[in-house]
UniProtKB/Swiss-Prot annotation:
Membrane-spanning intervals of the chain: none
Chief site of localization: nucleus
UniProt source species: Homo sapiens
Job description of the protein: May be involved in transcriptional regulation.
Pfam families: KRAB, zf-C2H2
Residue numbers bearing the Asymmetric dimethylarginine modification: R75
Domain KRAB: 6-78
Family: Belongs to the krueppel C2H2-type zinc-finger protein family.
Protein name (Swiss-Prot/TrEMBL): Zinc finger protein 30 homolog
Length: 519
């Protein structure tokens, strides 16, 4: 192709509603990112105020781009041409390579999309804009292009220098590298949450605009994409269409099956360049690398704890120096961080602005309400891809994943015991120090952990927030409810390795094993 005039109409693609529905969520996200980034590049190069095309407005709002008429793009390019000599502006080699032509955008979406498809014949694409064959190749001509052939040959020329993962398209590598750099350039103006990809921001913004959200009728969980809802609904109906031919284990999502099959093949494609350790999942490699990166970054000279950023280290230093600049005027208690003071003051004011609509219970923090509501809905949004176990809290998932990885990087200097999480080490060390900082105001009993105090206080209040949906029996502790529910389900997860007898509770198994240990 001749390297001459490149305008927005050359780097944009029209879709009808019918064609847009044929794309999966991955292809749609890539389309949004490519078009928005190209538009941003063109505007920055033009250096002037240009009326924004409707397709860009819709994409920024998370709406469907097929609603745009072609006349809008024509109006925008005429506006640009009237202000600048665009041929001179965009004819340079670097500019041309940065701004993809229209067929290249289509080609990229196709080649990336084929990785997610079972067969290339399933991809529903056709050219919409009527152009000459020289400027806009047809679908048949695209199949002969080198980049499109990469999707069949599995050629991935763009490799990440950090972890070695390779990609077929440069843009995918750019997105991926933000995982290592931590860059999240796209920020939501409503809530301040930041994202690595523009498409992720667009999808997130639908939560605020309530534009075409998909709600699960079983548990009320909200999705911004219909395909995500369909996959989620398999949890409720128990559908697991993807079965492992080796062991018969079935999965809801094809990606879970692919990961599982590596157990049988022994494949560990993700290798750490620092120590050579290999992992089955990329997420496990990333977690492992964070520990290595932390060792090289900001380390506390007092206790050796490492941080990825200097601000985290500065906050941590206050633990050792005892600096607590934010003091409560009511009781004199001081805090290291202003946010801690704000939350603490609600104890004195009694403010609990977050109330549960199911049971009326109120909370001083929105996060506590969110966690509480999952008791009623049964929602456990965080899934372990190794064993398909679900968790209500992300921290519980991270803690659990350490079981599969087998890493315990935090070692107690007193007794040598190692832990997966730094918080676990901190809790453990209080055993050696004899520290019990959490006191019950009712009976003066002290506890090492805040969670222990919270559980204990329910004895005085009589509160039993965890009720069984089968028989209505209520419990103080969630763990007690889980044990009770096994009576109804018949589940006995703890099996004796000697005689294969199974038990509902681990304590029952421990007691039983004494029979075999008697000499």
């Amino acid at each position: 192709m001749a390297r001459d005039l490149v305008m927005f109409r050359d780097v944009a693609v029209d879709f009808s509603q019918e064609e847009w529905e044929c794309l999966n969520s991955y292809q749609r996200n890539l389309y949004r990112d490519v078009i928005l980034e190209n538009y941003s590049n063109l505007v920055s190069l033009a250096g002037c105020s240009i009326s924004k095309p409707d397709v860009i407005t819709l994409l920024e709002q998370g709406k469907e781009p097929w609603m745009v008429v072609r006349d809008e793009k024509r109006r925008w390019t005429l506006d640009l041409e009237s202000r600048y000599d665009t041929k001179k502006l965009f004819q340079g080699k670097d500019i041309y390579e940065m701004n993809l032509s229209q067929w290249k955008v289509m080609e990229r979406i196709k080649s990336c999309g084929l990785e997610e498809q079972e067969s290339p014949h399933e991809v529903c694409f056709r050219q919409v804009t009527k152009t000459t064959s020289e400027k806009m190749p047809t679908y048949r001509k695209l199949t002969s292009l080198p980049l499109y052939q990469k999707s069949h040959n599995r050629e991935k020329p763009y490799e990440c220098g950090e972890c070695g993962k390779a990609f077929r398209v440069r843009q995918q590598l750019t997105f991926h590298q933000r995982i290592h750099t931590g860059e999240k350039p796209y920020e939501c103006k409503e809530c301040g949450k930041a994202f690595r990809q523009c498409a992720h921001l667009s999808r997130h913004q639908r939560i605020h605009t309530s534009d075409k959200l998909y709600e699960c009728k079983k548990c009320g969980k909200i999705f911004t994409c219909g395909s995500d809802l369909r996959v989620h609904q398999r949890i409720h109906i128990g559908e697991k269409p993807y079965e492992c031919k080796e062991c018969g284990k079935a999965f809801r999502v094809r990606g879970q099956l692919n990961l599982h099959q590596r157990i049988h093949t022994g494949e560990k494609p993700y290798e750490c360049k620092e120590c050579g350790k290999a992992f089955r999942q990329y997420a496990h490699l990333t977690r492992h690398q964070r520990l290595n990166i932390a060792e090289k970054c900001y380390e506390c000279k007092e206790c050796g704890q490492a941080f990825l950023c200097s601000t985290g280290l500065r906050l941590h230093h206050k633990l050792h120096t005892g600096e607590k600049p934010y003091e409560c005027k009511e009781c004199g208690k001081a805090f290291r961080v202003r946010q801690q003071l704000t939350l603490h003051q609600r104890i004195h004011t009694g403010e609990k602005p977050y109330d549960c609509k199911e049971c009326g219970k109120t909370f001083s923090r929105g996060y506590h309400l969110t966690l509480h509501q999952r008791i009623h809905t049964g929602e456990k949004p965080y899934e372990c891809k190794e064993c398909q176990k679900f968790f209500r809290r992300y921290s519980e998932l991270i803690s659990h994943q350490g079981i599969h990885i087998g890493e315990k990087p935090y070692e107690c200097k007193e007794c040598g015991k190692a832990f997966r999480l730094f918080s676990q080490l901190t809790q453990h060390q209080s055993i050696h120090f004899g520290e019990k900082p959490f006191k019950c105001k009712e009976c003066e009993k002290t506890f090492r952990l805040l969670s222990q105090l919270t559980q204990h206080q329910s004895i005085h209040t009589g509160e039993k927030p965890y009720d069984c949906k089968e028989c209505g029996k209520a419990f103080r502790l969630h763990s007690s409810l889980i044990q009770h529910q096994r009576i109804h389900s018949g589940e006995k997860p703890y099996k004796c390795k000697e005689c294969k007898k199974a038990f509902r509770q681990h304590s029952h198994l421990t007691y039983h094993q004494r029979i075999h240990n008697v000499t």
